[in-house]
Amino acid sequence: AFVWVANRSTSTSTLYDGAGVPQSLVVSIPPGVAGNARPTGIVFNGHSDFMVTANGMSGASAFIFAGLGGTLSGWSPGVDQTHAITVFDGGNAGAVYTGLALASRGASDFLYAADFRNATVDMFDAAFNKVGGAGSFVDQALPPGYAPYGIQAIGERVYVWYARQGAQTGVAVPGAGQGAIDVFGTAGNLVKRLVAPGGALHPPWGMAVGA
């Protein structure tokens, strides 16, 4: 088994084997209008959509990255083995993506990017077009200052975890009780509050589900 890691400081992604040994492949994530990509979220795409094109070649993205620079980038080894291709740039809108998820709804696939700065979850179709209404992924009961910080799709549910926005862009306020988790449907409808603010959570970012 291999593990892909998104490297925020170098705007790259590196590959490791199951023993933690780095492999020779290093993928560069291109900058956007707001500067370096600084990838934080990475998802595997096992389908034939989310196409990227460069140098006269097209192919489905095997991995898709989101980052603090507000970009989405897709990597297809048949298009460019060592570089991802920018497919969306939200830098002019101030987007700061701190997490990324991929889920299916019916026969269609969608990406979900947690925009910590603008306090939204941006939803994209399989052609990287932003979709979804203004009321998607909204919890009116959250206290002011909370924003989506991480995201994970599990089955037909999208789990969004929140943190309080700090003074520095993309950095959450630390401390116990500063985190919250909501559960949404893949269309962005709120299903339930899983963990309320003021509980045991520090700002949560990752989630894993045991078999």
Identify the residue ranges that each predicted region occupies.
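Beta-rich, blade/repeat-based domains predominating
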Residues: 1-3, 31-62, 69-71, 89-111, ...
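Beta-propeller blade signature
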Residues: 124, 176-187
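Structural signal for beta-propeller blades
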Residues: 11-14, 72, 119-121, 181
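Short coil turn/linker residues within repeat-based beta-strand modules
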Residues: 10, 20-22, 79, 118, ...
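A short beta-strand motif characteristic of beta-propeller blades
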Residues: 23-33, 81-91, 130-142, 189-199
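Hydrophobic/aromatic beta-strand positions that recur at structurally equivalent sites within the blades
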Residues: 16-18, 75, 124, 184
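Beta-propeller domains
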Residues: 5-28
